[in-house]
C-alpha cells in the first residue's frame, strides 16, 4: 500500500473552508521513511483519538506514577474520531487496523528525545500516553 502521502497528516495541518465545503492540507512533510496511508491514518488518530495538539498545550502535573491534567472535551473532535475509527474498522483488515494503532503509539514514542530536550514533563506525559494506548490494544 505504498503511496505518496502527506507525511504529517494531523488535524492542525488541515484547513476547512466552510463556504466551499473543502479541506486544504498544509505543511506537507515529504521526508518520511514510511510513505503509507496507514501512517497517515495514524497521524489523524494522533490528533483525534490521542488529542496531541490539545495535550501538547496543556499544563500537567506529575505525581509519582500519575500524570494529572484536565482534558477539555471538544465535541467536533470526538465526532471526527468516531467517524474515523468506524471508517478504519470498516475498510481495513484487522491486521492493518492493528498496524495503524501501533503507528499511533509510535507517533508519541518518536517524539520522546525531542521532548526531553525541550520539556521533560511533556516527555513523561507522552510516554504515559503511549503506554496507555498500548494497554488499550492489549485488552
Question: Residue locations for each model-derived region?
Answer:
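Active-site activation/catalytic loop segments of kinase-like enzymes and analogous catalytic loops
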Residues: 29-88, 105-120
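Sequence-level detector for tyrosine residue identity
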Residues: 1-4, 16, 29, 41, ...
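Active-site acidic catalytic loop and adjacent metal/ATP-binding pocket
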Residues: 1-37
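Regulatory N- and C-terminal appendages and interdomain linkers associated
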Residues: 21-23, 95-139
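Short amphipathic alpha-helical segments and their helix-coil junctions
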Residues: 21-31, 81-95, 133-137
